[in-house]
Amino acid sequence: MEFTTEIKKATDPIYQKISKVLPEIEWPVHAPYIHKINKLKKEKNAVILAHNYQTPEIYHGVSDFSADSLALYIEASKTSAGIIVMAGVHFMAETAKLMNPHKKVLLPDMNAGCSLSSYITGKDVRLLKKK
């Protein structure tokens, strides 16, 4: 995607938030995507909820709300958007869907996992309950 004058002008306020962690030389690579994603969010009535560990481009560039998983669930339950994009891991998107069964919940990276949540299985929990 091309880094045009229009995109530079539209994304300049966003770059000011990212400038301390993203070198200026890299901004022309990211800005067109950030600009396009932000336009699509408005067109599609979508909201992007991002976990704290996301990259600066996502955290500052496209997310509407960034926080820990609990705060993301609370925000997901309050949003009026018809589409929730969860920039996080599987269980975060699953919980957002449970709280919003009538809304579309998207997980951009299907390989996004959490070592803590995959450490124990349902079978493990059932065995622990028997003890």
Where are the model-predicted features located?
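Active-site loop-to-helix "anion-binding N-cap" substructures in soluble metabolic enzymes
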Residues: E2-K131
